[in-house]
Amino acid sequence: MTTDWAEIACEVPAEMVDSLADFLVELTGNGVGIDNLHLDTFSLDTLEDTPLKSVKGYLPLDDSLEEMRIRIEQFLAQTGPSFPGYVYAPPVVTVIRNEDWANNWKVHFKPVRIGQRLVIKPTWEEYLKLEGDLVIQIDPGMAFGTGAHPTTKMCLEALERICFDASGGKLPSPVLDVGTGSGVLSIAAALLGAKEIVAVDIDPEAVRVTMENLELNGVADLVAASTTSLEQLPGGFRVVVANILAEELVRLADELTARVAPGGWLILSGILTEKEAFVCAAFNSLELVENPKELEWSCLSFRKPL
């Protein structure tokens, strides 16, 4: 049985976009579209400087849709008046048939170079590989990252920098990927030389997509993907990467820190710059080494003392 989807579009002032987008991501667990800019599920295009934006969330077309619509209306009514230029307009719901959704979104996903050697390409696109390129093939489905979003991109760049600085030019093992999504970070870790990688996600569908992408890239023998909880995993990981929401990073701070080996790396993203200090405070036992930013997003790279 295929699932049809509902697109819920809300027209809001530009200043309200981040707040509404964060709310929709947490509410739906799926990608969010903002005019012609797509977060996480799609590639990044130029967002025109217009006073009003159409922010779009995506939900399965089922019995929960009406409840979700009401929650979005409540958020708009409660939050909107605090933003200049806000005028309430009810969300517009559009039904997207599964076969249209599954194919039409793909036009937004093109090969993208990240860092010096990593290239992410969808399975349906051709790419002429250059010498030294490490090409990650991804078929992300509809709800998991392509690698083009700034948070994923900064994590990939951090992994590549660690690789360049490491002995032998290979990423140290073992590696832990928390909230693996489509598996793109685990695949990159394997291509960068890590020989033992653990990928975990609370969503069984994310794990299924990850396992398919691991096979697609020929690294399934290097990565163990599962829904195993963080507290069930051992410590001793030389690299831990977690690209999840800031609030979750803070909630899991002790567990994440405990999984890092002495001298090891902890890479965190999914953090809005305004929440950077909030996250840093939760990891104050570690040394902050790098803090790149892109758009409104921040990435934090820590090292654990020996």
UniProtKB/Swiss-Prot annotation:
Gene3D superfamilies: Vaccinia Virus protein VP39. It catalyses: L-lysyl-[protein] + 3 S-adenosyl-L-methionine = N(6),N(6),N(6)-trimethyl-L-lysyl-[protein] + 3 S-adenosyl-L-homocysteine + 3 H(+). S-adenosyl-L-methionine binds at T152, G179, D201, N243. SUPFAM superfamilies: S-adenosyl-L-methionine-dependent methyltransferases. GO terms for biological process: methylation. Its EC number is 2.1.1.-. Keywords: Cytoplasm, Methyltransferase, S-adenosyl-L-methionine, Transferase. One of its GO terms (molecular function) is protein-lysine N-methyltransferase activity. CDD domains: AdoMet_MTases. InterPro entries: Ribosomal_L11_MeTrfase_PrmA, Ribosomal_PrmA_MeTrfase, SAM-dependent_MTases_sf. It comes from the Bacteria. Signal peptide: none annotated. Methylates ribosomal protein L11. Belongs to the methyltransferase superfamily. PrmA family. NCBIfam families: prmA (TIGR00406). This is Ribosomal protein L11 methyltransferase. It comes from Citrifermentans bemidjiense (strain ATCC BAA-1014 / DSM 16622 / JCM 12645 / Bem).
